[in-house]
Amino acid sequence: GDTAQLPPVGQIESPALSKKTLEGYGLEVWDMELTEIARQAAQSAILRNATSLRNLIQFSPLPMPALSLESGDDIENLSGEMLLETLSDCYGRDGIEESIVVTRSNKRATLFNLGVRNQILYREDELATGDMLLVSKNNYFWSEGYKELDFIANGDVMRVVRSRGEVESLYGLRFANVTVEFPDHGNVEIDVKIILDALTTDTPALTRQQNERLFSEVFEEQSGSKAERFKAMKKHPYFNALQVKYA
């Protein structure tokens, strides 16, 4: 693992990278660290900034980080007015799949996604053929029967091939039946049900209130013992609908 990576939530360090923790299990541990960068140009401004930030981690208290953002071979300093035009150029030159916007919050990610769809891709419908969607919650339901997919993972990207039928409104949510393909899994096509409301929430997926309502209403519809109800919910297409964001 990378020693500069964030540790698990609520922990000071990652136990998986701790020699002391592993020795506590009775293991004999050797440790080493790779420091030479092999897959980035030596004069890269990205590498220079990353190395500077990595070196700061050694100090306590941590100094205020500073980035050197002079335009160069791999950094171009843009004004906000130039962002959409530059992003459109990137899409045309490198493709949408090879162009990524990094932003500081889920709320701003939603704003960027809507701006891209409306002002670069000129898509007005909530969901359109060709839309790239990002799965925001692991799902084992819809991949069943497809040998190319063990499960649909949080972070998987899929492309809308076609919509099937009308939007359905149930449990306080809106559902759509779509055929999608997975570029990272040999473009395998599968039919899925997705929750449209999750596309534009300012949270990574559905809000807590939306999840609780979906769970309680689907649970109440089932019959039998508590265990039988839970078992039935595992096969319920609406309860197992994919939660996705624009990618």
Model-identified regions with their sequence ranges:
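Conserved helicase motor core of P-loop NTPases
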Residues: Q5-A153, R159-V161, G165-E221
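Long insertion/accessory domains within large nucleic-acid-processing enzymes
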Residues: D202-A247
